[in-house]
UniProtKB/Swiss-Prot annotation:
GO MF term list: glycine dehydrogenase (decarboxylating) activity
Name recorded for this polypeptide: Probable glycine dehydrogenase (decarboxylating) subunit 1
Domain of life according to the entry: Bacteria
Organism: Bacillus cereus (strain AH187)
Pfam families, per the entry: GDC-P
The keyword Oxidoreductase appears for this protein: yes
Amino acid sequence: MLHRYLPMTEEDKKEMLQTIGVQTIDELFSDIPESVRFKGDLKIKEAKSEPELLKELSQMASKNANLKEYASFLGAGVYDHYAPVIVDHVISRSEFYTAYTPYQPEISQGELQAIFEFQTMICELTGMDVANSSMYDGGTALAEAAMLAAGHTRKKKILVSSAVHPESRAVLETYAKGQHLEVVEINHKDGVTDLDVLQSEVDDTVACVIVQYPNFFGQVEKLADIEKIVHQQKSLFIVSSNPLSLGALTPPGKFGADIVIGDAQPFGIPTQFGGPHCGYFATTKAFMRKIPGRLVGQTVDSDGKRGFVLTLQAREQHIRRDKATSNICSNQALNALAASVAMTALGKQGVKEMARQNISKAQYAKRQFEAKGFTVTFAGPFFNEFVVDCKRPVKEVNDALLQKNIIGGYDLGRDYKEHENHMLVAVTELRTKDEIDTLVNEMGAIQ
């Protein structure tokens, strides 16, 4: 039988076998003992035509709670944000839609400039001097930042706030184990890093301190106070930040952060079951030659025209092999492009307005919950997430909400035993007043 995408005739098979010097398929696999060869018929359905296959896959996909039909209040690192329509158009162009790393600048100026623009916008948002072309996601960016700090300071202890995303902390633990580094968690108090505990833990053995801004609970950390503690012992100050929040919050670079990392998912990258994402990594000029990942620089060609190239390549795996600054090399260029297009389409004022709407709508939701008798756990300033005490298992609440076409918030009890029955609610610019009111009313009815 001829298949549409497997056009191999019997004549093709015969020619291939002759080329490699065997006569039959059995002879090709003669090294595999007869006793372990499968001789029956596979219990699978008959092949389907393309229309039949599309229909079946559509039926399977319809079982998912998709964000076109459900109002999502689930965040915890992956958010339902508006992506300008132009994003999909640009990233679908054949010039970009490839995993090829642009080693040859003479044929890759478009890709290189797109990466350069991404780096530039990340620097503008974070207040840092230099940014790389992307990382896999926020978690790997955080771990890579810690590895840079340990290598630079030659110290073995990493302090990380317990208010940093649990999955990012898990990635950090994996990296640290391989490098024989000690990871110490700093407890949170009232939803933010406990500064008294941090002060007692920072000493001359600490390579870096890592906090999140806004943190996993949505709270805005006091970066100015943390920076003073961190730099007393010449440790590095690493901040993981939601880039959209920086449209409203003071950039970490203004507070003296040495490295700012995070996930660019809020800009043009759909939730898509949790990935793939696009991490970013920004730092100061002092660490430019130690930064992981690709770096694109601007230069001029022999005719004096502006051009773009991969620069400082001696840091990288294809040059230095095991001595490279990182083993991340296949970057997220397509997702970085999506983020770049989204940021460009929104513009500076658009990013600010998008951030403002997140704050405004989240504040409205908080007031509605309190008016309904719910306790909002933490009283400090927050961006677009806050914690609500459900007084009962969050899974039960979310199961009930799902029946009303609502995707509820994140169950904090999965990661924090002290926050059992607490829900992390995310409210983005896409949520309407009616959707927020419906969420609060439905949860009130479940109480």
